[in-house]
Regions:
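Nucleotide-activated sugar donor-binding and catalytic core shared by glycosyltransferases
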Residues: 1-375
Length: 375
């Protein structure tokens, strides 16, 4: 019986890996699978060696670093001495997974990387580790394939998993009715992020901007997408200070808001790509710790951070970062989207091109077949 071990580090990787497992079981039901993962993989019947919930941290913190080193050694020992897989599938989470690959590549089993590190964005030298330690790379962006091929790395573009995961666009009137929104008003939805430090750094900025937007455009309403990782006690006191805006705080309604809003205020991340797939106009605004931004500026390889802009290699979506993340700039850019039809239509058309460029069906199916054929 063949054995596969999967390693993810946060929710998105867990979700993408679970989709692959679901397809693998159709092709190769006898395959024995264990993982470092979360609820999504567990729900597919995968035995978890450990839960990854404590791994998804950002920042330079010795406690985090030491815990990752210890966990990496523990996983490596388990793979070498106990589970002995035929293949290890690394999924996203480059900082941890690439370092682990340096150790486990010496053990003789195949190592495939699904959703590899974004070396085109920063720390391009990491491609040397990929070249040395990874047997095959499965990319989700078309431009990555050419980049890896130039380095002589075995690579295949499988498509972006979001294309299969994202629901069809819902009926806007139904969304408004079910969530207590006014059909006669424009909707601006706020996505302040899924991490505590993002809420602390961004939410007040976004709400102050919303207040300015409301003053200049009274026929606007606001909704806030609360991530499942953010507790009510963090959000509620902040929202209460903006009671004049009558903001609808919604949980588990991300796709409905992304699809039905007239404009979006987003923290940078995958949510921007999800919004692009719904062709919804947006701005990106992000402000993090100054020292982390300085480090990022030193190691970055590209000038853009928003995925739709990176994919098309042009400035489609406004990026308001660090010193440009101001109330004036956030509010004025949203007002321009709401009130300038020509600009709005231009952005919508550009977002359609993003969707077209990623269009290839069945990332999970393709990944599963490649694994099954090569394990």
């Amino acid at each position: 019986m063949k054995k596969l071990f999967i390693i993810t580090g946060e929710y998105s990787g867990d979700r993408h890996a679970a989709d692959v497992v679901r397809e693998l079981k159709k092709i190769n039901p006898e395959l024995e699978i264990e993982a470092v993962g979360g609820a999504c993989l567990a729900n597919e019947g995968v035995k978890l060696y450990c839960d990854h919930s404590k791994m998804s941290a950002i920042g330079f913190n010795w406690k985090i670093i030491l815990s990752h080193i210890f966990l990496g050694r523990t996983i490596a020992n388990y793979l070498k001495n106990e589970f002995k897989p035929d293949m290890v599938l690394l999924v996203d989470y480059g900082g941890f997974n690439l370092n682990l690959s340096k150790v486990i590549s010496k053990f003789g089993f195949k190592i495939y990387y699904y959703i590899p590190p974004q070396i085109w964005a920063s720390r391009k030298w990491r491609i040397n580790t990929v070249k040395k330690c990874i047997n095959k790379v499965l990319t989700i962006f078309p431009f990555e394939k050419e980049m890896y091929e130039k380095e002589g790395i075995d690579v295949e573009f499988v498509g972006h998993p979001l294309l299969a995961q994202i629901p069809e666009k819902p009926d806007k009137n139904t969304v408004f009715e079910e969530n207590g929104l006014d059909k006669d008003k424009k909707l601006v939805s706020i996505f302040p992020g899924s991490r505590v430090f993002e809420i602390k750094n961004l939410l007040t900025l976004f709400l102050d901007s919303a207040r300015v937007i409301k003053e200049k455009e009274p026929n606007v309403q606001f909704a806030l997408a609360q991530a499942p990782t953010i507790k009510d006690e963090l959000i509620k006191p902040i929202i209460e200070e903006y009671s004049d805006l009558d903001i609808k705080v919604l949980k588990n309604r991300n796709y409905e808001l992304l699809a039905s809003s007239d404009a979006l205020i987003l923290a940078s991340g995958t949510v921007a790509l999800e919004a692009a797939l719904y062709e919804t106009p947006m701005i990106i605004s992000y402000k993090g710790p100054a020292y982390l931004y300085m480090v990022y500026m030193l190691v970055r390889c590209i000038k853009r951070v928003c995925l739709p802009n990176i994919i098309m290699d042009e400035d489609i979506v406004p990026e308001l970062l660090q010193k440009n993340a101001t109330i004036d700039k956030v509010s004025s850019n949203i007002l321009y989207i709401l009130n300038n039809e020509s600009y709005r239509n231009s952005m919508v058309n550009s977002l359609k091109n993003v969707k077209q460029k990623l269009m290839t069906s069945g990332a999970a199916q393709k990944t599963a077949k490649i694994i099954s054929d090569n394990i």
